[in-house]
Amino acid sequence: MDLFEYQAKELFAKHNVPTTPGRVTDSAEDAKAIATEIGKPVMVKAQVKVGGRGKAGGVKYAATPDDAFTHAQNILGLDIKGHVVKKLLVAEASDIAEEYYISFLLDRSNRTYLAMCSVEGGMEIEEVAATKPDRLAKVPVNAVKGVDLAFAREIAEKGHLPAEVLDAAAVTIQKLWEVFTKEDATLVEVNPLVRTPDDQILALDGKVTLDANADFRQEGHKEFEDKDATDPLELKAKENDLNYVKLDGEVGIIGNGAGLVMSTLDVVAYAGEKHGGVKPANFLDIGGGASAEVMANGLDVILNDSQVKSVFVNVFGGITSCDAVANGIVKALEILGDEANKPLVVRLDGNNVDEGRRILAEANHPLVVQAETMDSGADKAAELANK
């Protein structure tokens, strides 16, 4: 889960990472009130989960509360790379002597943690990596040893930070490591990490991605969910513990196992080329369980997608046999009743496939069409979606 900047800074404050005071708002009047309360020049910053805010006009300096009001009016509703600004962070402006970069992330290719640090902050880090690779330090972090003050200082030194700020930077870097580990993050990034004229180190921006797999032990992270921005179907699927991702297509997909579902997406997309260009409408993996309740929840999510014209259920029976899947489909259709109003193409294969097909045939539901193979099932689903 990606956080907004103001949410990242809430975590920073929790772990004593120094930053500038400010508050989030969704109105220009409130932005003016916050600026008045701060009593100093402020930055008015669009809260969107995408980079390039400054270039898009989403970050403005306000010398007075009236300036904050004007900038807030202009920024609210702004479209930044497809993200409409609904919230603003009004934070105290800071004098900047130098800008640095620091991040912690997962290095999946090397199966370790990685610290990245550079004296060249305030610009896109990809640009630094491309044009000044010697100015960007990439330091592997031992998961067991972690980051103590000495190692944090070493990271700062390798990033070419000036000697006079190494100690102060090390303290902040260690605290950012604490955010990374204690909050179960997969990314913690500060760009820029600034040095003020009086040699303070401040995190002026923050980007944090939290690992959703750790939600069970991070109760406090629920408050960070942006339900307004989350697709309602994805929210509904999450509430029912379904692995669902909405796509822009017409054929709903249900499968068991991520690999099979991904293959199904490809086959449906290929079949759709000869049926009006229809595409997969979603990724939905029901995993190893195909009970009536799980199947009903999955179908309920997909059938509530107005773009869906047909559904392709593609299941390979393993631990969960095909007869159990077939019974789940039949019972799910009974549970949904009139809500089940779009054709279902069902392809079963694997453990107890003959019995599964017999159950579906005897049920003789008017919406269910059986397919022998994945290719024929994808073709039929694409054909039905194009009618």
Swiss-Prot record:
Substrate binds at residues 256, 318-320. Binds 1 Mg(2+) ion per subunit. One of its GO terms (biological process) is tricarboxylic acid cycle. GO terms for molecular function: ATP binding; magnesium ion binding; succinate-CoA ligase (ADP-forming) activity; succinate-CoA ligase (GDP-forming) activity. Residues 9-236 form the ATP-grasp domain. Mg(2+) binds at residues 191, 205. ATP binds at residues 45, 52-54, 94, 99. Keywords: ATP-binding, Ligase, Magnesium, Metal-binding, Nucleotide-binding, Tricarboxylic acid cycle. Its EC number is 6.2.1.5. Its cofactor is Mg(2+). One of its GO terms (cellular component) is succinate-CoA ligase complex. It catalyses: succinate + ATP + CoA = succinyl-CoA + ADP + phosphate; GTP + succinate + CoA = succinyl-CoA + GDP + phosphate. It is an enzyme of class 6 (ligase). Pathway: Carbohydrate metabolism; tricarboxylic acid cycle; succinate from succinyl-CoA (ligase route): step 1/1. InterPro entries: ATP-grasp, ATP-grasp_succ-CoA_synth-type, ATP_grasp_subdomain_1, Succ-CoA_synthase_bsu_CS, SUCC_ACL_C, Succ_CoA_ligase-like_bsu, Succinyl-CoA_synth-like. Succinyl-CoA synthetase functions in the citric acid cycle (TCA), coupling the hydrolysis of succinyl-CoA to the synthesis of either ATP or GTP and thus represents the only step of substrate-level phosphorylation in the TCA. The beta subunit provides nucleotide specificity of the enzyme and binds the substrate succinate, while the binding sites for coenzyme A and phosphate are found in the alpha subunit. Belongs to the succinate/malate CoA ligase beta subunit family. Heterotetramer of two alpha and two beta subunits. HAMAP family: Succ_CoA_beta. This is Succinate--CoA ligase [ADP-forming] subunit beta. It comes from Mycolicibacterium gilvum (strain PYR-GCK) (Mycobacterium gilvum (strain PYR-GCK)).
